[in-house]
Amino acid sequence: MESITNVPAANVGRVVQDFIDDGATNVAVEQNPDVTFNVTRN
């Protein structure tokens, strides 16, 4: 499992796409209280 934490909202789509392009089959996005996001791949 690999996570990138505190991703600004404007970059979430790019990070998710990068993970998918790299072969990830499961990508989870969770919002943090400070309006950044954590993106995790399995």
Predicted feature residues:
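Short, charge-rich amphipathic interface segments used for partner binding and complex assembly
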Residues: N6-N42
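Short glycine-/aliphatic-rich beta-strand segments at the starts of folded cytosolic domains
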Residues: M1-T5
